[in-house]
Amino acid sequence: MHEKVRDSFGRPLQDLRISVIDRCNFRCTYCMPAEVFGPDYAFLQEEFLLTFDEIERLAKLFAGIGVKKIRLTGGEPLLRKDLPKLIKRLASLDGITDIGLTTNGIHLTKQAKALKEAGLQRVNVSLDAIEDNVFQKINGRNVSTKPVLKGIIAAKEVGLEVKVNMVVKKGMNDSQVLPMATCFKEQGIPLRFIEFMDVGSTNGWNFEQVVTKQELIEMIGNVYPIEPAEPHYFGEVAKRYCYIGSDVEVGFITSVSESFCSSCTRARISADGKFYTCLFATEGTDLRALLRTNCSDNELLQVIQDVWRYRKDRYSDERTEESAKNRAKIEMSYIGG
């Protein structure tokens, strides 16, 4: 076990998000709009994706310098063939205490049991509306909520810890905030509202479309009073609340209205092996090239540590500054949310 590595602001490296694929079976307007990610879009070919051996090797190195939690993302990670085999390998690594997955839930019904048996502990399911007419417009594939809701139930039944994520955008699905809160309060499933963010350069973001945490709290609190809950750990992303008189949680991810850059402990690896230190990054460090040129573990580790030590990212603090406004940022579907 090497010494924990900290960045230039003293933030430790604790969480690793690994994108296993850049493809998705949805075309959500805020992430992979169909007019950009159309039939001719050049997704990564299989030979450019990190192999399971390469992912395991990197995860082991990250675990050795303080990473405890791994989250698998995409694209849609359940499109990656044999994903439970990767999870089993990651779950066996010394130092890794938590493995999660973010998914649109379409394939959860079929895969939940195998994922759980492989060592997956928790799953976050993206669902941006409870009413089909709204959800179908958002996902761009005319898919109803039914398979997603079935996937959520399947995940719970096999013993996975389940949370639901909802990106809220004014004029798109803000009408769904209360129906979603009602649905998942009744089911006892934590729901996390995510402020619409300017990730990437293709989702047409502007601040006027953001529904802030304070607005969401007022919308929900008028019907279901809520109170703040204590954070579980340093670097926790969601601001957690509980419905009064209940232990059911609701959370808010406030990248726009209340930056959490000062406590960000997350690194990201894209499906083709680039190492990013911020969700809003403009460039990454190519670890795949090192993996495929007989680079030693010590050499790889030195690169990883150096990148993190020199990390100065605080985009959400700088969002309104002129220098941040025209940055060409990496797309969320490529880097993982």
From Swiss-Prot:
SUPFAM superfamilies: Radical SAM enzymes
GO molecular function terms noted in the UniProt entry: 4 iron, 4 sulfur cluster binding; cyclic pyranopterin monophosphate synthase activity; GTP 3',8'-cyclase activity; GTP binding; metal ion binding; S-adenosyl-L-methionine binding
Catalytically driven reaction(s): GTP + AH2 + S-adenosyl-L-methionine = (8S)-3',8-cyclo-7,8-dihydroguanosine 5'-triphosphate + 5'-deoxyadenosine + L-methionine + A + H(+)
Protein name (database record): GTP 3',8-cyclase
Pathway recorded for this protein: Cofactor biosynthesis; molybdopterin biosynthesis
Binding site for S-adenosyl-L-methionine: Y30, G75, S126, M197
Originating species: Bacillus cytotoxicus (strain DSM 22905 / CIP 110041 / 391-98 / NVH 391-98)
Domain of life: Bacteria
Similarity-based family: Belongs to the radical SAM superfamily. MoaA family.
